[in-house]
From Swiss-Prot:
Part of the 30S ribosomal subunit. GO terms for biological process: translation. This is Small ribosomal subunit protein uS10. One of its GO terms (molecular function) is tRNA binding. HAMAP family: Ribosomal_uS10 (MF_00508). PANTHER family: 30S RIBOSOMAL PROTEIN S10 FAMILY MEMBER. GO terms for cellular component: ribonucleoprotein complex; ribosome. It comes from the Bacteria. It comes from Synechococcus sp. (strain CC9311). SMART domains: Ribosomal_S10.
Amino acid sequence: MSTAIAQQKIRIRLKAFDRRMLDLSCDKIIETADNTAATAIGPIPLPTKRKIYCVLRSPHVDKDSREHFETRTHRRIIDIYSPSAKTIDALMKLDLPSGVDIEVKL
C-alpha cells in the first residue's frame, strides 16, 4: 500500500440538452488527451435527467386540458490519468460548443 504512487487524475463532467453536441465534445476532449500522451477513460454515460413541465392549454378555465413539456439533461464523465502540463494547456485552449456545460476537477 505504501509503495503505490498516487496517480494524478483530471475528472471532466459534461452536461448538455443535445446528446449529439455532447458526444462531439467528448470526442474532442479524448482526442486532445490522446494527442498529448495522456490516458483518457470514457466517456462514461451517466443517467439522463428528465424535467417535465405541466402547462394549462387554455388561458381561462379548462383545467382538464393540459400540455406536458420535458427537458432532458444528458451527462458524461471523462477521466484523464497522468496529465502533463501540455495536456492541461491543450484542454484549456480547446474550443467547445456553448450548449455544453463543463466542470473540471483535479
